[in-house]
From Swiss-Prot:
Gene Ontology MF terms in the entry: DNA binding; transposase activity
Organism: Escherichia coli
Protein family per UniProt: Belongs to the transposase 7 family.
One of the Pfam families matching this protein, by short name: DUF4158
Protein name: Transposase for transposon Tn2501
Residue ranges crossing the lipid bilayer per the database entry: none
NCBIfam families: transpos_Tn3 (NF033527)
Domain of life: Bacteria
The protein's role, per its UniProt record: Required for transposition of transposon Tn2501.
UniProt KW keywords: DNA recombination, DNA-binding, Transposable element, Transposition
GO biological process: DNA transposition
Length: 994
């Protein structure tokens, strides 16, 4: 049986490589006086150089250069310079094997190094075991192994020996994981797990049924999901069966199990099969729990939206009648006024303009029209009580809700409703909890005759939604609705990191010093902008008693930019999209990142099938239609590629490869240095099955859709994309900055109005990012200061009457640091925390304290916005790049009417990732050929204005064939280092125009 491969060939090459880093090379080549004395004992110059090189390698990186691993040229030249020798002596030394071994023996004694023996290998495997229990990624384990060898003064063995050691460590860890997951399983548990794999006739297996997505948003599907949860509970798996296993391992096993058919799972050895099924079931239970809650939230949202629409429709229908009644009562009122002034009989005056019986009828009609139900949609919500009643009893029975102290009253109300369902009570007990009921609900719920049951249930279930989002109530077994504290770094670990100054935050950890520095900066900036405002020196900004008026930026694009762009794009070849993908892969090798789910070193045998699958995602064609449009591809072969090679992490790594390649292009430096970026959401309509997964985001209208939130660098590379729900864009801004895998080092980020909240301002600052949103209603925003507004008369009209609450920050400083450190270290995602903070009631201390920091940072930003037109231009330019990229994405994502028709979030995510990868490939391809076009123009004597080059965009697509049959052609495949021919253009015409 072949040995398990742990490291890919690329990783093997990377493992023992000296980086081109001046500091590392300088440290490595340092020789002290004792070293020099030892080196000089050797007579021949070549021997002295060779001995010194071996010394530096053994003491530094820890391995020995040989014929297959030639020393770094900078190392040889530095050491030769230090010893006043010629660097070309190394080949002479390397040819003397016997001398080399004698020198190594001498160096082992001098450096007190030990060879890598079998006993040390066993010690190394024992050291690696806890790491291998957390991950089976070979390169991470290899780095840890080398660190252990170095710290124990052990000579690095060959890569082959390292690989064998890692393979043994990973295999032992695999067995330990399987054993730990199955140790508590009894015979009945194993029998129940095996029954999940069985199917009758054409029916799917029980396991396949458990893993089905929710489908349409209705009570029926909530009940089906609850049936699935109950089926999992009926398995009776021991509590905490997975607690001893690291989350990375659990997720990998669960992913493998979900991708495999029941028939393939049944072929596993018993211990591996049961371990895999346990992981799949535990993951499915958490997913089902979250999906039940999400279905409930969306059903409630639908019911409230429907009530609003019904109320609006009824109001519209009665509008004419209301208008006629108003006119009628104006007439009656005028008659009464006239009667009072003239002393006439008022009753007769009324009857003169309106017969008495008609007056009585009119009063009754008006009384009907003035019902609150005609103006407040809450009065109509109980018309759909049957929808809630259909699933609520079983949902409350199936899920275990646990409340924090602020939500205990609401938790008691849930118990009351659960008890009413169980006892089949018709009325709400008089002693039922009511303290949680908001003011807007109280008159509906608390009536003179007692508590209205329907409104009470609706109110409780609606308040539950908010409490779950904020974390005031959490759900046992959930992934998304856990206890808030469980998301954060453990308190003891946080204190240890803080004490050792390892929080990795961009601010001082001492609260007093931090606040003093920020208040000093704020006061200084206020004084500066106040003086400029009084003198009228703010560029294009006027601050008066009426507020702020900012003159829009003038178009700074040179008039020659458009003709120059036309000339350059006219020279670009006209490739098919398939040719672009293949050519970009030849340049970058991005497809090597699409590793097999079960073995990180396995790649698809047919690289073009992988590219075809990526293309199907990116152009929104789908696998079925792509198989019909691509000769040689079948639906089953594409599905196999998607099942085993397409994942979020493989897409992310491939995207990073393209972004890094773009960053390395000389032309990209004209557009930016890769330190600024922008982000924006793009809405795609949903159709077919996708309409069940689509959500309404009011920013894009009332129709459901799917939003893809994309981050793009100043070099036009989209470096992060994520499918987001109906929540505000700002929830996901930090995710792209923290979790992208490229080499970009973003320091400043731009968004539009939807991308900012004060919580985002605060966290951006704490994590070291300069945040610059383009705020549409900036004239309505206020500056927050600590002190009296009278000190700044030039800004008084835009200073808030509410002062900064510094005490809130001081009181919750430790919580703020712990939250920020947890996000920075990846313990929890930024988007999840921002979403929970936004859902907190106003009195929550942490949310309020973070808001105060956000107010400080937003005030500083607004002052910079007023005084610095350069900032305004940078933000505008950054957002323009994002909008241009969205236009390219819309053009690429053309099939199926541009609609997303996948109902599962996983497949929607693949669509977003494929689209982002495709636009990144087009951007890189355009950049390379624009460079070649410019070089060609230079050779023809055309003067190139660098300012015009900076205004070129690599986001054009008119020259690319995006439609038709998707054919991979062998006869026009380009060789290494070869490019397509540029097209001929009339440069004389351009000279005349310019």
């Amino acid at each position: 049986m072949p040995r398990r491969q742990i490291l890919s060939s690329e990783e093997q090459e990377r493992l023992l490589v000296i980086p081109d880093d001046e500091i590392i090379l300088t440290r490595m080549c340092f020789l002290n006086e004792q070293d020099i004395a030892l080196i000089n004992k050797h007579r021949r110059p070549a021997n002295r150089l060779g001995f010194a090189v071996l010394l530096c390698y053994l003491r530094g990186p820890g391995f020995i250069p040989d014929k297959s691993n030639v020393p770094h040229s900078s190392v040889i030249s530095r050491i030769a310079s230090r010893l006043k020798l010629q660097p070309d002596l190394w080949p002479e030394y390397a040819s003397r094997e016997q001398t080399r071994w004698e020198h190594l023996t001498e160096l082992y004694r001098y450096l007190k190094l030990s060879p890598f023996s079998r006993s040390l290998q066993k010690d190394c495997i024992r050291h690696l075991h806890p790491y291998a229990m957390r991950t089976d990624k070979g390169f991470m384990l290899a780095e840890e192994m080398l660190n252990w060898l170095h710290s124990n003064n052990v000579i690095f063995p060959s890569v082959d020996v390292i690989e064998r050691t890692l393979a043994e460590a990973v295999t032992l860890a695999d067995r330990a994981v399987f054993s730990a997951l199955t140790a508590q399983l009894e015979k009945q548990h194993k029998s129940a797990l095996d029954s999940l794999l069985k199917s009758e006739g054409e029916q799917a297996s029980r396991l396949a049924w458990l893993l089905q997505p929710p489908g349409k948003i209705n009570g029926k599907n909530v009940l089906q999901h609850i049936d699935r949860l109950n089926s999992i509970a009926a398995l009776g798996l021991p509590d905490g069966i997975t607690l001893s296993i690291h989350q990375n391992r659990l997720l990998k096993l669960a992913r493998e199990g979900r991708k495999m058919s029941s028939r393939d799972l049944a072929k596993f050895t018993d211990v591996r099969r049961y371990a895999t099924l346990v992981c799949v079931i535990q993951e499915a239970q958490a997913t089902l729990t979250d999906e039940v809650i999400e279905l409930h939230e969306r059903i409630l949202g639908t019911l409230f939206s429907r009530a609003k629409r019904t109320q609006a429709e009824r109001l519209q229908l009665t509008g004419k009648l209301i208008q006629s009644k108003l006119k009628q009562y104006v007439t009656v009122g005028q008659a009464l006024l006239h009667a009072r002034e003239s002393g006439e009989d008022p009753w007769a005056a009324i009857e003169d303009v309106l017969p008495w019986q008609e007056f009585i009828n009119s009063l009754e009609e008006t009384q009907f029209l003035s019902r609150k139900g005609n103006f407040d949609p809450l009065h109509l919500i109980t018309e759909k009580y049957s929808t809630l009643r259909k699933y609520a009893p079983r949902m409350l029975s199936a899920l275990q809700f646990i409340a924090t102290p602020p939500a205990q009253t609401l938790s008691d109300a849930l118990d009351t409703i659960r008890d009413m369902y169980r006892k089949q009570l018709r009325k709400v007990p008089p002693a039922a909890p009511t303290g949680f009921i908001p003011e807007s609900w109280r008159k509906l719920v608390l009536t003179p005759s007692g508590i209205d049951r329907k409104y009470y249930e609706f109110c409780v279930m609606n308040e539950l939604k908010g409490a779950l989002r904020s974390g005031d109530i959490w759900v046992k077994g959930s992934r998304r609705y856990r206890n808030f504290d469980d998301y954060l770094i453990p308190a003891a670990e946080f204190e240890k990191s803080r004490h050792n100054d390892q929080l990795q935050l961009a601010v001082q950890t001492d609260c007093r010093a931090y606040l003093q520095a920020r208040m000093t900066l704020l006061a200084s900036r206020l004084e500066e902008v106040n003086a400029m405002a009084l003198a009228g020196d703010l560029p294009d900004v006027d601050i008066s008693d009426k507020g702020v008026k900012i003159t829009p930026l003038e178009n700074s694009v040179p008039s020659g930019a458009s003709p120059f762009a036309d000339l350059v794009y006219g020279m670009l070849p006209h490739p098919k999209i398939t040719e672009i993908l293949e050519e970009v892969d030849n340049w970058t090798g991005f497809t090597r990142h699409f590793a097999h789910l079960k073995n990180n070193n396995v790649r698809p045998k047919d690289g073009r099938l992988l590219l075809t699958t990526i293309l199907a995602d990116g152009i929104n064609l789908g696998l079925t239609k792509m198989a019909e449009s691509c000769p040689g591809a079948t639906k089953s072969s594409l599905e196999g590629i998607q099942a085993w090679y397409i994942r979020d992490e493989t897409y992310s790594a491939a995207l990073a490869e393209l972004v890094n390649a773009q960053k390395a292009r000389p032309l990209a430096a004209f557009w930016g240095d890769g330190t600024t970026s922008s982000s924006d959401g793009q809405n795609f309509r949903v159709g077919s099955h996708g309409r069940y997964a689509g959500q309404v985001n009011l920013k894009y209208g009332q129709e459901p859709g799917v939003q893809i939130y994309t981050h793009i660098s100043d070099q036009y590379s989209p470096f992060y994309a994520k499918v987001i729900s109906r929540v505000r864009d700002s929830t996901h801004v930090l995710d792209g900055l923290l979790y992208h895998e490229s080499d970009l080092e973003i320091t400043e980020h731009y968004t539009d109005t939807a991308g900012f909240t004060e919580h985002v301002f605060a966290l951006m600052h704490l994590l070291g990012f300069a945040f610059a949103p383009r705020i549409r209603d900036l004239h309505d925003k206020r500056l927050f200061i600590h002190g009296k507004a009278e000190r700044y008369p030039g800004l008084q009209s835009v200073i808030s009457t509410t002062s900064l609450n510094i005490k809130d920050i001081e009181a919750h400083w430790d919580e703020i640091l712990r939250l920020a450190a947890s996000i920075k270290q990846g313990t929890v995602t930024a988007s999840l925390m921002i979403k929970k903070l936004a859902s907190y009631p106003k009195q929550n201390g942490l949310a309020k304290a973070l808001r105060e920091i956000g107010r400080i940072e937003r005030t500083l930003f607004m002052l910079d916005w007023f005084r610095d037109p350069g900032l305004r231009r940078r933000v505008q330019a950054g957002l323009n790049k994002g909008e241009a990229r969205n236009a390219l994405a819309r053009a690429v994502f053309m099939h199926r009417l541009g609609e997303i028709r996948d109902r599962g979030l996983e497949n929607q995510s693949y669509r977003a990732s494929g689209l982002t990868l495709l636009t990144a490939a087009i951007t890189l391809w355009n950049t390379v050929y624009i460079e070649r076009a410019i070089e060609s123009l230079k050779r023809k004597g055309i003067p190139i204005n660098n300012q015009l080059v900076s205004h070129l965009s690599p986001l054009g697509w008119e020259h690319i064939n995006l439609s038709g049959d998707y054919v991979w052609r062998n006869n026009i495949k380009l060789g290494s280092g070869k490019y397509r021919s540029l097209r001929t253009v009339d440069t004389e015409l351009y000279k005349k125009q310019s």
